[in-house]
Amino acid sequence: MIVIAIIGIVAAFAYPKVNFTQFRVDAAARTVRVALQNAERLAVTRQYDVVVSFDTVNSRIRILEDNNNNATVDAGEHVIYAPLEDSVHFSVPPTGISGSVGGPINGGTIKTVDGMPTLIFHRDGAASSDADIYITSKRASSDDYRCVRVIQSTGRTLWWRYLNGTWEQASL
């Protein structure tokens, strides 16, 4: 019984030091990465374009199975929305991985579809553009920024954390 009481006291002191926001932002980065990986895989499997649009206003990702490859939502085409974690949104970081940043979604040839920045995955798995997608928490602390990077030629995704003023590649 005494051991349980000691564990409870130690836990009470440790609880305020746990950074739950960091876990939410990490989960949101994984959500973005998984959505992009699934879109790429779907494009290769189904052999048509999959259009991924970033709804920066509503903090969600729209995934369109574009059967006729026209980059617009038509009748009969399947659309899925993937919301970001609670209190996480797309945002411009203090500095980008490769220098200055113009917006939360950056890339060489990012398209705009229905007023949203958009990547298109083609049937060979390649993306329409390289891209850096930046997210953060509502409090926007500098250590809360995350980035998911898409490599255009292969559609491969990587994710990064902004910690202590530098970008560090994260795993899983």
Q: Which residues make up each language-model segment?
A:
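N-terminal helix-rich module
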Residues: 1-4, 9-33, 37-41, 49, ...
